[in-house]
């Protein structure tokens, strides 16, 4: 005998349990998002070489290239036309003997970052320019500060050197400085340096307050030639399980004068982003979708595991849901097209 489908009497269902009427249409699903991705949220990282005519693909970062100053304007012009609003500059010294123990090339007036700042201010007056402030790309040892003879970080000299670099970027025309070194006390010294230079009122200090050590930076270190020659950065970058430390670092950097906060990496640290949006609710929170995260999504899409556009939106919408207002993303060029 054929079984007859049975229907239970559900007349006691609570009205409040019916949710699907709120998202049964594509527009309704958009309205359910607390925030929408928009072009003005995106910050595009740029690797700027001290070889003026360089235009070199980075194998471990699909679709990302390293440019010399002479190639920057031509590359950026169509992106600016599509709505690019902000870039984050990383200098990459490639010339022989360009690195030393103090990272002297970081703020060399003839170096890649200061030359790029001046070029971009002239060519794209409306483009917002952030500069990463760190020494790892420029030091002979590849660490983010000045070292003692035993290889440990000399905090006092490091923060003084980082402050000098930040001030020199601001003097050259950078709108924002973004210290990524994670050395204790550098936000205070940078803020004091900007005050002394008369630039604090027009320079946004975007602190990498919650930057974790881990396994997601490999492609970046290829691009920036910044891997440590010995040891690692675990003594100054946060341990991956250190949520309490991250909360303390967020409070510290706010107390020292940070105007904005970066959480890095992002996908695996949404709890930290949510913490940041609570602790630093009065300043912009920025998610950094780092090189390893970007490369993983490309690899998954290439293997046919995911659709690249769909996973890009899902991951980046997750940052907004966790509390980010801004996103540093290597996918910025794609999003400029997708959001048009």
From Swiss-Prot:
Species per Swiss-Prot/TrEMBL record: Eremothecium gossypii (strain ATCC 10895 / CBS 109.51 / FGSC 9923 / NRRL Y-1056)
Record: residues binding Zn(2+): 134, 136, 144
Gene3D superfamilies per the UniProt record, alphabetical: Aldolase class I
GO annotation (BP), single: protoporphyrinogen IX biosynthetic process
Subunit structure as annotated in this protein's UniProt entry: Homooctamer.
Cofactor: Zn(2+)
A GO MF term: zinc ion binding
InterPro entries (alphabetical): ALAD, ALAD_AS, Aldolase_TIM
Pathway(s): Porphyrin-containing compound metabolism; protoporphyrin-IX biosynthesis; coproporphyrinogen-III from 5-aminolevulinate: step 1/4
Protein name (database record): Delta-aminolevulinic acid dehydratase
Binding site for 5-aminolevulinate 2: 291, 330
Record's keyword terms, sorted: Heme biosynthesis, Lyase, Metal-binding, Porphyrin biosynthesis, Zinc
Binding-site residues for 5-aminolevulinate 1, renumbered to this chain: 221, 233
């Amino acid at each position: 005998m054929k079984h007859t489908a049975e229907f239970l009497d559900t007349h006691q269902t609570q009205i409040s349990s019916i949710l699907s009427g709120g998202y049964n249409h594509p527009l309704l699903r958009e309205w359910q998002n607390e925030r929408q991705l928009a072009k003005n949220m995106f910050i595009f990282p740029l690797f700027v070489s001290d070889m003026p005519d360089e235009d070199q693909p980075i194998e471990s970062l699909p679709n990302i290239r390293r440019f010399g100053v002479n190639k920057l304007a031509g590359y950026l012009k169509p992106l600016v036309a599509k709505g690019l609003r902000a870039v984050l500059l990383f200098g990459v010294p490639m010339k022989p003997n360009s690195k030393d123990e103090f990272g002297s090339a970081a703020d060399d007036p003839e170096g890649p970052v200061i030359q790029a700042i001046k070029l971009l201010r002239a060519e794209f007056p409306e483009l917002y320019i952030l500069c990463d402030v760190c020494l790892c790309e420029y030091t002979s040892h590849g660490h983010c500060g000045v070292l003692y003879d035993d290889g440990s970080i000399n905090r006092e000299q490091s923060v003084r050197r980082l402050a000098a670099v930040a001030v020199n970027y601001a003097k050259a025309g950078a709108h924002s400085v973004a210290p990524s070194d994670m050395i204790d006390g550098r936000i205070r010294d940078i803020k004091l340096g900007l005050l002394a230079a008369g630039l604090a009122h027009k320079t946004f200090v975007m602190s990498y307050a919650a930057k974790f050590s881990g396994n997601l930076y490999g492609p970046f270190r290829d691009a920036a030639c910044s891997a440590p020659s010995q040891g690692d950065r675990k003594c100054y970058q946060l341990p991956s399980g250190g949520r309490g430390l991250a909360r303390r670092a967020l409070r510290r950097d706010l107390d020292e004068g940070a105007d904005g906060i970066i959480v890095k990496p992002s996908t695996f640290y949404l709890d930290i982003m949510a913490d940041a949006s609570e602790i630093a609710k009065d300043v912009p929170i920025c998610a950094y979708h780092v090189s390893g995260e970007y490369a993983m999504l490309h690899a998954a899409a290439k293997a046919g595991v995911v659709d690249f556009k769909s996973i890009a939106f899902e991951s980046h919408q997750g940052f907004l849901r966790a509390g980010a207002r801004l996103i540093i993303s290597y996918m910025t060029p794609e999003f400029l097209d997708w959001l048009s």
